[in-house]
């Protein structure tokens, strides 16, 4: 029986993580979780899983939950999030929160020698050097939950990582993959939220449409697998059947395939190095699919992917700036305060405005994050 702490239980990854726990009650126990403002959902999860600690975002929601939570301790805010991440009984911490708020809980959980199931891209994007140093220092495993990084991780099982020639990350292309730049001037929030392959939260769905999501994954892959950016390629693959590939020195290429279902990589992170049945996910039927398609990525068409490569290669504090600018811009787009292509413009302005710090401390990263958010808000 593995004890799990889950950060971000009400989001897309969080709800699918609970599906996995539900499928294997003899293998996993939920000891703590966090939610934002979805209190009705939190009540249902408490009643089903009887965790010891639950964290909510707002202090005013604590009393509402305490009235129905029985023996479950209710905490709130950033301190509450840390309490969930550091639960003494938790062996695995699944970080499924969205945004840079996931950084500090990840670092503290690593210091507490918890195994980390990492679904929060922003943690490695903003502070990859700090996270990987901490993981090495405390001998902690970072197990990828993203389908692309899980695919690479599985392809590398038993392989000599020094023999890697390149990583090939696949991209569905998002909601607007078939639209021209001119057509993107007129797209709506509702258009952007209709992803062709995956069911995800609103922020990551917009990131998929701008291709920032893939850019974040490139930076994440750089840190997780220690591969230079020059050896990380992105290929457009509309079917989302091949989740990523690894090419080795001898030009052999290994790929991980499967139907688009996030529960597969989530469960693998929880069961690694073992595997368990996942019977209610669709079995891959290659003759039904028939043909798989691949296209070269156009970084002028998808400018956010170019920004991510530039930020990653520049290094230091630049990825944190790009990430903070993106979070503010995407939120403004979701609120219909800016157009779709303005997201790119705001990110570019923030990156051009920033003076890079080569090896920022945690405090400097948090300061830069806050300053960038203020700068972008002033531009809107």
Curated annotation (Swiss-Prot):
Which keywords annotate this record?
Isoprene biosynthesis, Manganese, Metal-binding, NADP, Oxidoreductase
One GO biological process this protein is involved in is: isopentenyl diphosphate biosynthetic process, methylerythritol 4-phosphate pathway involved in terpenoid biosynthetic process
Claim: S-adenosyl-L-methionine is one of the keywords in the record:
no
HAMAP family in the record, alphabetically? DXP_reductoisom
One GO MF term: NADPH binding
* Job of this protein: Catalyzes the NADPH-dependent rearrangement and reduction of 1-deoxy-D-xylulose-5-phosphate (DXP) to 2-C-methyl-D-erythritol 4-phosphate (MEP).
Q: Where does NADPH bind?
A: 10-13, 36-38, 120, 122, 201
So where does Mn(2+) get bound? 146, 148, 217
**Keyword Manganese belongs to the record:** yes
Q: Which residues bind 1-deoxy-D-xylulose 5-phosphate?
A: 121, 147-148, 172, 195, 208, 213-214, 217
> Taxonomy-wise, where does this protein's organism fall, top ranks first?
Bacteria, Bacillati, Bacillota, Bacilli, Bacillales
Which PANTHER family does this entry report, sorted A to Z? 1-DEOXY-D-XYLULOSE 5-PHOSPHATE REDUCTOISOMERASE, 1-DEOXY-D-XYLULOSE 5-PHOSPHATE REDUCTOISOMERASE, CHLOROPLASTIC
Pathway of this protein? Isoprenoid biosynthesis; isopentenyl diphosphate biosynthesis via DXP pathway; isopentenyl diphosphate from 1-deoxy-D-xylulose 5-phosphate: step 1/6
EC assignment: the record states 1.1.1.267
Protein's UniProt name: 1-deoxy-D-xylulose 5-phosphate reductoisomerase
């Amino acid at each position: 029986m593995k004890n799990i702490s889950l950060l971000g239980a009400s989001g897309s990854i969080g709800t699918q993580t609970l599906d996995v726990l539900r499928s294997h009650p003899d293998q996993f126990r939920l000891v703590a979780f966090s939610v934002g403002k979805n209190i009705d959902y939190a009540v249902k999860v408490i009643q089903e899983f009887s965790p010891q600690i639950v964290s909510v975002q707002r202090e005013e929601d604590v009393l509402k939950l305490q009235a129905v939570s029985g023996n479950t301790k209710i905490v709130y805010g950033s301190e509450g999030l840390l309490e969930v991440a550091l639960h003494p009984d938790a062996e695995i911490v699944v970080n499924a929160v969205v945004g840079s708020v996931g950084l500090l809980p990840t670092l503290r959980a690593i210091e507490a020698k918890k195994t980390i199931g990492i679904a929060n891209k922003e943690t490695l994007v903003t502070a990859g050097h700090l996270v990987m140093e901490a993981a090495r220092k405390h001998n902690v495993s970072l197990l990828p939950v993203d389908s692309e990084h899980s695919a690479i991780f599985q392809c590398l099982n038993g392989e000599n990582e020094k023999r890697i020639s390149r990583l090939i990350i696949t991209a569905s292309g998002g909601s607007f993959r078939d639209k021209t730049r001119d057509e993107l001037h007129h797209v709506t929030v509702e258009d952007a939220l209709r992803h062709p392959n995956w069911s995800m939260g609103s922020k990551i769905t917009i990131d998929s449409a701008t291709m920032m999501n893939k850019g974040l994954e490139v930076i994440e892959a750089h840190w997780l697998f220690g591969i230079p950016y020059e050896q990380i390629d992105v290929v457009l693959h509309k079917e989302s059947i091949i989740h990523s590939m690894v090419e080795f020195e001898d030009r052999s290429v290994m790929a991980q395939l499967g139907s688009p279902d996030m529960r597969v990589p989530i469960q693998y992170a929880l069961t690694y190095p073992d595997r368990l049945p996942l019977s209610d996910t669709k079995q891959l039927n290659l003759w039904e699919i028939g043909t798989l398609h691949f296209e070269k990525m156009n970084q002028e068409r998808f400018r956010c992917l170019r920004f991510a490569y530039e930020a990653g290669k520049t290094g230091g504090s630049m990825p944190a700036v790009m990430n903070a600018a993106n979070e503010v811009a995407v939120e403004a787009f979701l609120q219909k305060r800016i157009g779709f292509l303005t997201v790119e413009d705001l990110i570019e302005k923030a990156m051009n405005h920033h003076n890079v710090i080569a090896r920022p401390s945690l405090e400097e990263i948090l300061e830069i994050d806050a300053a960038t958010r203020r700068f972008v808000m002033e531009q809107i």
